[in-house]
């Protein structure tokens, strides 16, 4: 069986567990195809209780060591004591930190959060989306953040997202524990990836976040308590919107969802 060559991939997510929940399948897929993969996490510090779990999750996905921006979580002050919350941190500073990671790793593709903050609209998700948009553009401009290393321009930026038609079983479960459910129109999705062959790796990465799995109101906790068949239906497809470069007129991605079952991002 020939494994298609896939581009290098850098995930940028707000919290430990976002990487496995939102893009664990494509990270595992790209790694299995021999591509370089890595993840930058915006909140929680190196000495926090969740960083060892993040390390285990990244190991399960083949995504290397944890790379941290080091900011505090908007809803959990123990994430990075003494550090500003991500939502309060100077935007220029946060962008500069991410630019340094992009230039150091030199990814072909960056994938991060969408503009609505995924299903729950977490403010850290929204802020990470804003930081990622700016950092991907700035990383390719030599006159910006010269201290962050030689410029590097990723070829594309994708946002992990949830289309209205894909919320299905998950929506009522989140509403049942008092969480918001925010989805985008199906037409906003440009790529849907069937990650079934890598679902076991993705699930192992989710389970690595042991503290979240133990919390019944968290998404990992909700998934862990579902029948296996229902859980598999939720985690085996990942949806993305290509943000840059914008689809050209007449590009197939403008016509709605493009399935890349074997090609990843």
Which ranges hold each PLM region?
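Active-site rim/loop-helix segments in enzyme catalytic domains that contact anionic ligands
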Residues: 1-106, 137-138, 239-244, 249-250
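Metal-dependent de-N-acetylase/amidase catalytic core
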Residues: 1-8, 81-82, 89-265
């Amino acid at each position: 069986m020939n494994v298609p060559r896939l581009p290098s991939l850098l995930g940028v997510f707000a919290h430990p567990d976002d990487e496995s929940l939102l893009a664990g399948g494509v990270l595992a897929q790209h790694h299995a195809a021999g591509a370089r993969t890595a993840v930058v996490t915006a909140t929680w510090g190196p000495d926090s209780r969740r960083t060892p779990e993040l390390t285990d999750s990244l190991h399960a996905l083949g995504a290397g060591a944890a790379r941290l921006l080091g900011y505090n979580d908007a809803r959990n002050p123990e994430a990075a004591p003494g550090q500003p919350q991500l939502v309060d941190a100077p935007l220029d500073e946060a962008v500069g930190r991410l630019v340094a990671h992009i230039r150091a790793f030199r990814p072909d593709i960056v994938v991060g959060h969408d503009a609505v903050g995924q299903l729950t609209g977490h403010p850290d998700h929204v802020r990470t989306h804003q930081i990622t948009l700016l950092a991907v553009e700035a990383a390719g401009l030599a006159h910006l953040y010269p201290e962050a290393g030689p410029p590097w321009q990723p070829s594309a930026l994708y946002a992990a997202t949830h289309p209205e038609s894909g919320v299905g079983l998950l929506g009522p479960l989140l509403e049942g524990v008092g969480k918001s459910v925010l989805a985008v129109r199906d037409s906003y999705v440009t790529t849907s990836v069937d990650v079934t062959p890598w679902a076991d790796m993705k699930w192992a990465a989710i389970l690595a976040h042991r503290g979240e799995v133990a919390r019944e109101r968290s998404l990992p906790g909700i998934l862990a308590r579902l029948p296996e068949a229902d859980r598999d239906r939720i985690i085996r497809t990942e949806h993305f919107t290509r943000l840059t470069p914008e689809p050209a007129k007449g590009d197939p991605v403008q016509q709605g969802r493009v399935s890349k079952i074997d090609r990843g991002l």
